[in-house]
Amino acid sequence: MLTEHWLAWLYWNPPREAFTLPFIDHPVMWYGICFITGFILGYFIIVPIIALFVNQSKHLSSMDIQDWRSLVNQLKTSSSPLIQKCQNALNRQERQKLNSEIQPLNISSDLKNALLIKLNTILKENSIQRKDLEQAFQGAITSAKQISYFLADRLCWFIVFGTLIGARLGAVFFYDWNYFKSHPLEIFEVWKGGLASHGGALGVMLALFFYTSYIKKWTPTLSFLRVLDFVAIPSALTAVFIRIGNFFNQEIIGTPSAYPWAVLFAQPADGSLPIPRHPVQLYEAFAYLMTFFLLFTLWKKCNTCLAAGTYAGFLFIFNFSSRFLLEFWKANLDSILTNPILQMGQLLSIPFILFGICLVWRKQNWQNLFCCHR
């Protein structure tokens, strides 16, 4: 039966190296290109997501004030109705401090705190948005776009380190501990391969926890679950490119298949026989792509009207449910388990699915999910 479909199968044997860097003579792998492409695209997705959160935020901190001197001068001289409203909100003592700043080069911390309190009081009114204050105090209040780049730049570094460290340790402890316990120094040789997505997910979550603590001094209203939501949508897209990278590397291959769309991997990374198999890497990439479109559509419709953690919850449910099901079409991977009923990837997916259900299964979420519109 296998020979009947021979002409329909894709023979897959691309070079793992895309090119070699000049001068240092170091090969650049297709997997690395896919990995970096996913991160770069994810960065440009996460910036507008953060910008929307900043725009809708009802809190200003010292980070949001770009030029205190300009702010004070405009409060003293501008005839803008909104600025006049801010000025009228000041008490007598605060107005005296404001007017005493003849050359406001070194504005007192007391006056800064007082002005921030008044600006936040006005911002909490339903009719006032952050963009209104940005337009009124031109050049004095940092734009939401600038802040989103500031937050995204730092967030990406946390994600990169969390992904690499978590994915590497996940591969070491979940899949190949028997080897690495005898070769501990090789744990640091990440360039030789050996990354696990579940470990990467745990590493990113831990990194986001540290990021939230780090960023609190600038954005005290930003919670861990909200940051998790920021990362959810680009993570789904990044996962697509990672699986495409696995396809180039001929790793994480599927079980033997006689279907017309089967792929004959000529040089599987695990050294197995070059026979037609399910291109399970592409199955996963497609599933993650559908998750990305679903989350992106939901964000365009509801953005921040859903409770914090909802987008991350959907990501965990859909991505790891897909992973759980598609493991049945994957060739068995070495792991610390002996004669398991389920593969390691399936067992590790279950806690993420349950955590996702906990994040989504909240009453206010279902009300907002079907009522929000743009």
Curated annotation (Swiss-Prot):
Pathway terms, separated by semicolons: Protein modification; lipoprotein biosynthesis (diacylglyceryl transfer)
Database matches in InterPro entries: Lgt (IPR001640)
GO cellular component: plasma membrane
Family: Belongs to the Lgt family.
A single GO molecular function term of this UniProt record: phosphatidylglycerol-prolipoprotein diacylglyceryl transferase activity
Entry-linked PROSITE patterns: LGT (PS01311)
EC code(s) of this entry: 2.5.1.145
Topology term for the membrane: Multi-pass membrane protein
Keywords carried by this UniProt record: Cell inner membrane, Cell membrane, Membrane, Transferase, Transmembrane, Transmembrane helix
Protein name as catalogued: Phosphatidylglycerol--prolipoprotein diacylglyceryl transferase
Localization annotation: Cell inner membrane
Organism: Protochlamydia amoebophila (strain UWE25)
One GO term of the biological process aspect: lipoprotein biosynthetic process
Statement: the UniProt record of this protein carries the keyword Transferase: yes
Role description: Catalyzes the transfer of the diacylglyceryl group from phosphatidylglycerol to the sulfhydryl group of the N-terminal cysteine of a prolipoprotein, the first step in the formation of mature lipoproteins.
Group of enzyme by EC: transferase
Chain segments annotated as transmembrane: 33-53, 155-175, 195-215, 222-242, 279-299, 306-326, 341-361
Binding locations of a 1,2-diacyl-sn-glycero-3-phospho-(1'-sn-glycerol): R243
